[in-house]
């Protein structure tokens, strides 16, 4: 989420300054989470690279893993869904991890992510305009608030 929220803060800055600031502030929390996970990996004797294990191999994370919507509603929905997925993942991990200290860290991070969910839901309610239909040409609209200018 760090790279995505950085991107989102940039493309929303000019026309949605408050949204941009929310992404900046939430991103600071997400960077702290990344730091916590990195330090935890080191303490557990693991290399803190940005990679994951899948089907017997290590795969590096890259920004191409992100989705980059530019419609304000889709952008906020994507961020909200990412937070919800993270909460589910951390809950699942806390179920099988036996170390109480690590579970406590996960629970603290879950609390942060739940706050982010509330923030994104609040922002979505402010921008509750329907998205233009993708199967037809969008009509000219005098209201430029549905798409983040690029």
Segment roles from a protein language model:
Residues 1-150:
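Non-heme di-metal
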